[in-house]
Regions:
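Structural signature of extracellular immunoglobulin-like
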Residues: 10-17, 24-32, 67-77, 86-89
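Flexible inter-domain hinge/linker segments at boundaries of tandem extracellular adhesion modules
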Residues: 28-38, 51-52, 77-78, 86-103
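Short, solvent-exposed loop/linker segments at the N-terminal edge
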Residues: 1-9
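Extracytoplasmic/periplasmic beta-strand context in beta-sandwich domains
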Residues: 25, 56, 81-83
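Eukaryotic short linear interaction motifs
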Residues: 2-3, 20-21, 34-35, 67, ...
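Short, charged helix-to-loop "capping" segments that act as catalytic/coupling loops
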Residues: 16-21, 49-53
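Extracellular beta-strand/loop-rich beta-sandwich domains predominantly from IgSF
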Residues: 1-2, 40-70, 76-77, 87
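A short local loop/turn or secondary-structure capping micro-motif enriched for an aromatic residue
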Residues: 43-45, 81, 103
């Protein structure tokens, strides 16, 4: 997933109810648990129980390059899911991509 600096990142993890619902859902960036109370601010989590299971949405506002990473949603019961997020200026990415293709 590619996003521009200053935009909002919204990642949703849906945990389907097969047996027991998860007692907790933890989010990670790379290998570190996300701290919703960090000095960076602008990071929030919304968890919602639905008839089908649980939905957890991670919201990161005013994205910067420091927010680039592999985001993982890890429920206490069930399998984790991950997505790679890149915060880049579109022009910089096109130049890098052109360089990689030229090699």
């Amino acid at each position: 997933m590619f996003v521009k600096p200053g935009s909002t990142i919204s990642l949703t993890c849906s945990i389907r109810l097969f047996s027991s619902p998860p007692t907790s859902i933890q989010w990670f960036r790379d290998t570190r648990a996300l701290n919703l109370d960090s000095a960076r601010g602008g990071v929030s989590l919304e968890n919602e129980k639905t008839p089908q299971g649980t939905r957890s949405t991670l919201i990161v506002t005013k994205a910067t390059g420091d927010d680039t990473g592999n985001y993982t949603c890890s429920p206490s019961s069930g399998h984790a899911a991950s997505v790679m997020v890149h915060v880049v200026d579109g022009k910089q990415y096109l130049v890098k991509l052109a360089f990689e293709i030229a090699r």
